[in-house]
Amino acid sequence: MLVYLAEYLTQFYTGFNVFSYVTFRAILALLTALMFSLWWGPKLIERLQVLQIGQVVRNDGPESHFSKRGTPTMGGLLILAGIFIGVLLWGDLGSRYVWVMLFVLGSFGLIGFIDDYRKVVRKDPKGLIARWKYIFQSLAALVVAFYLFYSTKHPGETQLVVPFFKDILPQLGLMFIVLTYFTIVGASNAVNLTDGLDGLAIMPTVMVAAAFALIAYLSGHVQFANYLHIPYLPGSGELVIVCTAIVGAGLGFLWFNTYPAQVFMGDVGSLSLGAALGTIAVLVRQEILLVIMGGVFVMETLSVILQVGSYKLRGQRIFRMAPIHHHYELKGWPEPRVIVRFWIISLFLVLLGLATLKLR
C-alpha cells in the first residue's frame, strides 16, 4: 500500500525511491509484523483468558501436558494479523502473488478458526468434523490451483524443479493442478500435526519461510535464476515481502509460545501457515525442496501415517504415541529437549535445501 504513496512522493524527494527496493520493504514488513505481534500479544492473551478460550488436552496424552489445559489458544490470530498488516503496508498490491497468498492465509485461517471455535467455545471436542475440514481445505486449494494454472504468464510457472538436476525441468501441464492441490493441503495438515509442543511448529515455519524469501528473491532476478538453473519468475520478488512478514509475525508469536507457552496458535495458525508454505513452494516452483526443508513436518506426518497403518494392518503400534514428538516425550525426554532438537534438525534440513540450489 505505502509503495504507491512512496512512488508518488518520489517526484518531490528522490529519497523515497528506496521503497521501490524489495529488500528494503521486506525488512520493513518483518519489523512491522514482529513489533505488532510483540505489542498486541499480551493484550490478546489477556483477552483470551477473560473469554476462557483455553486449550483442550487429550486425556490419553503425556501426563506432562495436563498442566497445559486451559492455556489460551487461537493465538494464530495474532500471527495472521501481523502478516496481513506487514504485507498490506509494504507489499505491492498490484501483484497477483500477494493476493494469492492473502487468500490462502485468510481461507485456511478461517477453516482453522471454525475448528478452534467449535472446540474451545462450543466445547465440542471433535471441533470441525474431519470430513468437512478436508472438503473446505480442498476447495480453497483447488481455487488456487486452477487460478494459477489458467493465469500462467511465463513457461517457468508450470515447470517442476528437481533438486540436483539442472537440466530436468519438465512441463507439468494439468498435473500442475494435482501437484498444487496436494502440496497446499499436505503442507497445511503437516504443520497442524507438528503443532503439539511449545514452539515446535512455529520455529521450523520461520526457518522455511526465511529460506523461501531468499529463493523468491533469486527467482525474481533473471541473472540469478539463470545462474542457478531455476525458473525465472517475473514479479516473484513480492513473495519476499510475504515470507519476511511470516518470519516477523512468527518470531513475535514465539516470544509468547516458547516453553512454557503463554498461548498456543491453534488450528487457525497451523493450518494457515502450513498452507502458506505450500503455496509459496508452488509459486516459486520448489515443491520438492519443501519436502527437504520442511522435513520435520514430513517426519511428523509420516509417523502418524505409519502408526495408523501399522495398527490397522498388524494390530501393533510402531511408536509409543504419534505424532513422533510425543513418542520421545513418553521415552522420558523433557519437552524442551524434544523441541530444540527438532529445531536443530529443521535448521540442518533448511540449509541442506538451500545447498541444493548450487549442487546441480
From Swiss-Prot:
Co-factor(s): Mg(2+)
Reactions catalysed according to its record: UDP-N-acetyl-alpha-D-muramoyl-L-alanyl-gamma-D-glutamyl-meso-2,6-diaminopimeloyl-D-alanyl-D-alanine + di-trans,octa-cis-undecaprenyl phosphate = di-trans,octa-cis-undecaprenyl diphospho-N-acetyl-alpha-D-muramoyl-L-alanyl-D-glutamyl-meso-2,6-diaminopimeloyl-D-alanyl-D-alanine + UMP
Keyword Cell inner membrane listed: yes
Any one GO cellular component localisation term in the record: plasma membrane
Pfam families reported in the protein's UniProt record: Glycos_transf_4, MraY_sig1
Record EC number: 2.7.8.13
Stored InterPro entries: Glycosyl_transferase_4, PNAcMuramoyl-5peptid_Trfase, PNAcMuramoyl-5peptid_Trfase_CS
Superkingdom as given in the UniProt entry: Bacteria
Enzyme kind, highest EC tier: transferase
Pathway: Cell wall biogenesis; peptidoglycan biosynthesis
Listed CDD domains: GT_MraY
Subcellular location: Cell inner membrane
Keywords from the named record: Cell cycle, Cell division, Cell inner membrane, Cell membrane, Cell shape, Cell wall biogenesis/degradation, Magnesium, Membrane, Metal-binding, Peptidoglycan synthesis, Transferase, Transmembrane, Transmembrane helix
Biological process, per Gene Ontology: cell division; cell wall organization; peptidoglycan biosynthetic process; regulation of cell shape
Transmembrane segments: 26-46, 74-94, 97-117, 132-152, 168-188, 199-219, 236-256, 263-283, 288-308, 338-358
Bilayer topology term: Multi-pass membrane protein
Any GO molecular function: metal ion binding
Record PANTHER family: PHOSPHO-N-ACETYLMURAMOYL-PENTAPEPTIDE-TRANSFERASE, PHOSPHO-N-ACETYLMURAMOYL-PENTAPEPTIDE-TRANSFERASE HOMOLOG
Function (record text): Catalyzes the initial step of the lipid cycle reactions in the biosynthesis of the cell wall peptidoglycan: transfers peptidoglycan precursor phospho-MurNAc-pentapeptide from UDP-MurNAc-pentapeptide onto the lipid carrier undecaprenyl phosphate, yielding undecaprenyl-pyrophosphoryl-MurNAc-pentapeptide, known as lipid I.
Family: Belongs to the glycosyltransferase 4 family. MraY subfamily.
Protein name: Phospho-N-acetylmuramoyl-pentapeptide-transferase
Species this chain originates from: Shewanella amazonensis (strain ATCC BAA-1098 / SB2B)
Organism lineage string: Bacteria, Pseudomonadati, Pseudomonadota, Gammaproteobacteria, Alteromonadales
Gene field: mraY
